[in-house]
Design a protein with these regions (language model features):
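N-terminal pre-core extensions flanking Radical SAM catalytic domains
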Residues: 238-239, 246
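Short, active-site-adjacent cap segments at secondary-structure transitions
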Residues: 71-75, 123, 145, 230-233
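Amphipathic alpha-helical segments at domain termini/boundaries
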Residues: 2-28, 32, 175, 180-217, ...
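An acidic, glycine-rich surface segment that forms the CoA-thioester-binding/catalytic face
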Residues: 45, 49, 53-57, 79-119, ...
Length: 249
């Protein structure tokens, strides 16, 4: 699934599954279905693409923080909706097959630095947002689990992309064990999936805001160039020519 081009739609259109907020130079994209553990239904999928585009094109926003409302960060596709809505199932299957789902910052081609602030359980498709963030911090009570295999599904993009952040064996173990094992925030930090643990958990938003403001002190052009240089190497690899490392073309 390749990186796309940012899109934006009128900010007057209300969000029903997300909260889009701004605090100084930091924009916040908050999953807002706490009663459903922030699972993604068809409406949220559509809103995510619009929200990423809106924040990326806002000149006042230098850094974007992604987090969840309530006790969960993000728990992937709303299985209940998919099970009860044949049209939603067909559409999700088609977009997955055709690689046209655009719900993370990477999918939507966001140029600005993105911080994932994992505030609770991150499960299944929620791992996409960890894999595709530039920086990941987590509350001390955050957990990570990949239940796909436990419900007869195969891990796809999220497992592959998550392996860019940490040991392949750890990703494979999580994929094979499924819902029977949860990775703690401490373990995720030890393996390199997370760069900071926040304790107490209630301090997560403040710490993410501070980190965002620190990053925002750098010129936006430099931030975008640095981000794209790093991601381009991860996507395309490097080639050694005349004793120097360059991104492959």
């Amino acid at each position: 699934m390749g990186r796309g081009t940012p899109v934006v739609s009128p900010t007057t259109t209300p969000y029903t599954r997300l909260r889009v907020e701004r605090e100084g130079p930091v924009g916040w994209l908050v999953f807002d279905r706490p009663d459903a553990a922030n699972a993604m239904d068809a409406v949220m999928f559509d809103e995510l693409e619009r929200a990423w585009g809106e924040l990326d094109l806002d000149a006042e926003v230098r850094v974007i923080v992604n987090t969840g409302a309530g006790k969960a960060f993000q728990t992937g596709v709303d299985v209940a909706q998919v099970a009860n809505d044949r049209d939603a199932l067909r559409e999700h299957s088609r977009r997955t097959r055709d690689a046209t789902l655009r719900f993370t910052a990477w999918h939507c081609g966001v140029h600005k630095p993105v911080i994932a602030a994992v505030n609770g359980v991150c499960a299944g498709g929620g791992l996409h947002f960890v894999a595709d963030a530039d920086v990941v911090i987590a509350s001390s009570n955050a957990t990570f689990v990949d239940p796909h295999v436990s419900i007869g599904q195969v891990v796809a993009y999220e497992g592959i992309t998550l392996a860019r952040k940490g040991p392949v064996e750890s990703v494979m173990r999580m994929a094979l064990v499924g819902r029977h094992e949860r990775m703690t925030a401490a373990r995720a930090y030890q393996l390199g999936f997370v760069s900071q643990i926040v304790d107490p958990p209630e301090r997560l938003r403040a710490e993410a805001q501070t980190l965002g403001e620190t990053i925002a002190q750098t010129a936006p052009e430099a931030l975008a160039a640095m981000k794209h240089a790093m991601w381009d190497v991860l996507e395309e690899g490097t080639t050694e020519e005349e004793g120097t490392w360059t991104t492959s073309t």
